[in-house]
């Protein structure tokens, strides 16, 4: 009778294994990992004495602390049965090219329920074995070598507890079947010592593991998912726990979330499908992805709103925000920050909650935190649940993105009426990527009116071109964008768009402020002024009455009727102030601006209606948020001190006032007094750029303060590109009001 060689990796559990082997007739011979050579082992095998090998548990890492174990495994595969326990499993996985890393949990002397495939060493063993664990490392499913298959996992968290070689009689378990707290340990050892030779099949057919080339016996499946837990199942279990915990917190309870939605506390929606279809080029679904199960950390410190603005300004149609915290390091707060960051864009991207959505509560969460759509993964949902979640999402105004991985899942997606279907080239059960998946699913669509998207593995223009030729409308790109050194250039190159270029502006517009009569107005209009400002601040020297302002308004409207506008479609990639300045520049002119300072909102609204103002200028300490309630574009004044300090609010904040006016003003405020501030400060502020543009898009401003016909050209030159309008009042006045020659000279100096 031959013996079982038990390699001891200096672990006390070796003696338990020895006892189990002996009790089931395994005739164990134990030797420590540094007290025997591979040559000696080969000799035992040649002499017909060695029938099987067990690699024991042990401390440390398999590469540094397992002695001869790895060499023994490499030699013995295909010759005789091998069983690895704990460190033994790690040796096998590491030797074959897999990754051994942190398991996501530390278990020392703890038990877990283990579910298994009921074949091999698990033949005839009951399910959900209570099993003792002593480890913090484990095999990583995303890097598991293709020659190995998962045989068992923990029921609670999906950590790999067992692997098997697909061809050779090599088995391994991560837990300790030899422990007195583990169930089925001796049954497992009894199965192992019955195995013969080095390959499956033949005399090993009794245990159910198919020989190479044979088909595995079918197992019960749901929606194509294997009965054994995979990374997808593990995430599924964790997300259920996450949601359960969130629902228990009073502030995020289902009732509170529902109430918030009923109060319209959520941001307004845009139509996800329409946003995709209306994109004039291939729609990019740009993903914010800090990490993933398959790649680990990608960009763990990335700012979600910053990344979102890069994507939006480069032309992304959708921003996909991963909100799963454990494997992808995302959060709902990321999504809300992204939604707020892009809110001021003229044609903002749709926001997708990319997560493993399992309940109506998660859809409510998505809506409350700013999503326009959610991802529904067919592989994670039973057909009835898929239908219920799809219908519920649509009832909230959110057409879901339904993810499929094969024609069978496509059929389920079509049955529920999906209008936007994404094909994941990555199988979520094993995280392998097959770039032909999208093509196969597209062929199965048979020309149906569905927006088809490719969802993974896309990193080049060639990848995109291939799918576009097959009818794909949108592509989701995550890792490649997150790793790109120039995000905007890379995104545009993916879909064949030229690099973004800042279009040089024409000469600035001219605003003549302090118009006090129709004569002043005629003079300014005749000289070619674009905007006329009337002061409506009681107690100031240039303040005019409402009746005079109405007369000036009528004159301005008459002159405007004879001018032409420049039709302008806001660029999909233009930020707030650039868009607003372009829109104002394209309008028929002249335009009438009413100037107010520290007056009530009701007074301002009354004046807009009574006078017929085209714009409002807030020249005092009014809240910027008032711009939301004023029915015409708002110019907000910000004071620049001699030291370059800006006062008056958040001058770069988008989404409120349509224009920024920089005027002189010291610590106490001031401004509007014909005093200049150093123009290099204006240049610095302009070059700080629109929010999210990283300085590549100058901040458009109206330049005011101490301008005259003699210095305005120098001011524009020193302040640089970004001055889209210049504002003058006292610089073109004489004792009796506006001076024709000065006004004409000023306009000429600006226009060149």
Curated annotation (Swiss-Prot):
Pathway: Amino-acid biosynthesis; L-tryptophan biosynthesis; L-tryptophan from chorismate: step 1/5; Amino-acid biosynthesis; L-tryptophan biosynthesis; L-tryptophan from chorismate: step 3/5; Amino-acid biosynthesis; L-tryptophan biosynthesis; L-tryptophan from chorismate: step 4/5. Its EC number is 4.1.3.27, 4.1.1.48, 5.3.1.24. L-glutamine binds at residues 58-60, 136-137. GO terms for molecular function: anthranilate synthase activity; indole-3-glycerol-phosphate synthase activity; phosphoribosylanthranilate isomerase activity. The active site is at residues 86, 176, 178. Residues 231-495 are annotated as: Indole-3-glycerol phosphate synthase. Residues 509-752 are annotated as: N-(5'-phosphoribosyl)anthranilate isomerase. SUPFAM superfamilies: Class I glutamine amidotransferase-like, Ribulose-phoshate binding barrel. It comes from the Eukaryota. Residues 3-202 form the Glutamine amidotransferase type-1 domain. GO terms for biological process: L-tryptophan biosynthetic process. Coiled coil: none annotated. Gene3D superfamilies: 3.40.50.880, Aldolase class I (3.20.20.70). It catalyses: N-(5-phospho-beta-D-ribosyl)anthranilate = 1-(2-carboxyphenylamino)-1-deoxy-D-ribulose 5-phosphate; 1-(2-carboxyphenylamino)-1-deoxy-D-ribulose 5-phosphate + H(+) = (1S,2R)-1-C-(indol-3-yl)glycerol 3-phosphate + CO2 + H2O; chorismate + L-glutamine = anthranilate + pyruvate + L-glutamate + H(+). Keywords: Amino-acid biosynthesis, Aromatic amino acid biosynthesis, Decarboxylase, Glutamine amidotransferase, Isomerase, Lyase, Multifunctional enzyme, Tryptophan biosynthesis. Trifunctional enzyme bearing the Gln amidotransferase (GATase) domain of anthranilate synthase, indole-glycerolphosphate synthase, and phosphoribosylanthranilate isomerase activities. HAMAP family: PRAI. This is Multifunctional tryptophan biosynthesis protein. The gene is TRP1.
């Amino acid at each position: 009778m031959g013996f079982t060689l038990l390699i001891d990796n200096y672990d006390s559990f070796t003696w338990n294994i020895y006892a189990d082997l002996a009790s089931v007739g395994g005739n164990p011979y134990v030797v420590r990992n540094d007290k025997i050579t591979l040559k000696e082992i080969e000799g035992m095998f040649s002499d017909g004495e060695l029938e099987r090998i067990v690699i024991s548990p042990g401390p440390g890492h398999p590469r540094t602390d397992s002695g001869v174990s790895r060499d023994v495994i490499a030699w013995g595969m295909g010759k005789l049965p091998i069983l690895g326990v704990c460190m033994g499993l790690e040796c096998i996985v590491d030797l074959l090219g897999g990754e051994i890393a942190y398991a996501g949990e530390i278990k020392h002397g703890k038990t877990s329920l283990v579910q298994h495939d009921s074949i091999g060493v698990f033949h005839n063993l009951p399910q959900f074995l209570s099993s003792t664990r002593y480890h913090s490392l484990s095999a990583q499913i995303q890097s598991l070598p293709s020659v190995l298959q998962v045989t068992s996992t923990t029921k609670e968290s999906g950590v790999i507890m067992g692997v098997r070689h697909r061809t050779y009689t090599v088995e391994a378990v991560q837990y300790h079947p030899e422990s007195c707290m583990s169930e089925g340990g001796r049954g497992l050892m009894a199965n192992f010592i019955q195995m013969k030779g080095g390959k499956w099949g033949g005399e090993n057919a009794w245990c159910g593991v198919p020989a190479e080339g044979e088909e595995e016996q079918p197992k019960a499946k749901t929606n194509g998912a294997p009965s054994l837990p995979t990374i997808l199942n593990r995430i599924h279990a964790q997300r259920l726990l996450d949601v359960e915990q969130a629902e228990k917190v009073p502030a995020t309870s289902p009732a509170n979330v529902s109430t918030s939605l009923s109060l319209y506390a959520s941001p307004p929606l845009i139509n996800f499908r329409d946003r995709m279809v209306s994109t004039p080029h291939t729609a990019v679904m740009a993903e914010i992805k800090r990490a993933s199960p398959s790649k680990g950390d990608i960009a763990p410190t990335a700012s979600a709103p910053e990344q979102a603005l890069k994507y939006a300004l480069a032309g992304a149609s959708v921003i996909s925000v991963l909100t799963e915290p454990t494997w992808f390091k995302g959060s709902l707060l990321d999504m809300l920050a992204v939604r707020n960051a892009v809110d001021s864009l003229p044609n903002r991207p749709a926001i997708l909650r990319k997560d493993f959505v399992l309940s109506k509560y998660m859809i409510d969460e998505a809506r409350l935190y700013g999503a326009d759509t959610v991802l529904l993964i067919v592989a994670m949902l039973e057909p009835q649940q898929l239908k219920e979640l799809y219908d519920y999402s649509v009832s909230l105004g959110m057409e879901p993105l339904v993810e499929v991985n094969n024609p069978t899942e496509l059929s389920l997606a079509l049955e529920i009426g999906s209008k936007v279907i994404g094909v994941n080239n990555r199988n979520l059960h094993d995280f392998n990527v097959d770039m032909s998946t999208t093509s196969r699913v597209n062929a199965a669509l048979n020309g149906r009116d569905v927006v088809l998207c490719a969802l993974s593995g896309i990193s080049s223009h060639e990848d995109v071109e291939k799918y576009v030729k097959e009818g794909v409308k949108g592509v989701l790109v995550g890792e490649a964008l997150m790793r790109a050194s120039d995000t905007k250039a890379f995104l545009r190159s993916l879909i064949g768009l030229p690099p973004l270029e800042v279009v040089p502006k024409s000469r600035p517009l001219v605003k003549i402020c302090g118009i006090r009569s129709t004569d002043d107005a005629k003079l300014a209009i005749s000289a070619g002024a674009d905007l006329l400002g009337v002061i409506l601040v009681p107690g100031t020297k240039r303040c005019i009455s409402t009746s005079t302002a109405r007369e000036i308004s009528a004159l301005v409207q008459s002159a405007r009727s004879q001018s032409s506008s420049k039709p302008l479609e806001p660029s999909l990639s233009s930020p707030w102030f650039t868009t607003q300045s372009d829109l104002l520049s394209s309008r028929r002119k002249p335009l009438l601006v009413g100037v107010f300072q520290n007056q009530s909102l009701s007074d301002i609204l009354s004046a807009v209606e009574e006078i017929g103002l085209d714009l409002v200028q807030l020249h005092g300490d009014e809240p910027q948020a008032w711009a939301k309630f004023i029915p015409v574009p708002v110019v907000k004044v910000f004071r620049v001190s001699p030291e370059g300090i800006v006062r008056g609010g958040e001058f770069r904040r988008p989404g409120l006032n349509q224009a920024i006016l920089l005027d002189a003003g010291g610590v106490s405020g001031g401004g509007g007094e014909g005093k200049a501030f150093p123009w290099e400060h204006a240049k610095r502020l302009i070059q700080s750029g629109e929010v999210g543009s990283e300085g590549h898009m100058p901040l458009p401003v109206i330049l005011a303060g101490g301008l005259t016909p003699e210095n305005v050209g120098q001011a524009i030159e020193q302040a640089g590109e970004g001055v889209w309008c210049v504002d003058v009042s006292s610089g073109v006045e004489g004792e009796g009001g506006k001076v024709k020659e000065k006004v004409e000279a000023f306009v000429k100096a600006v226009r060149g």
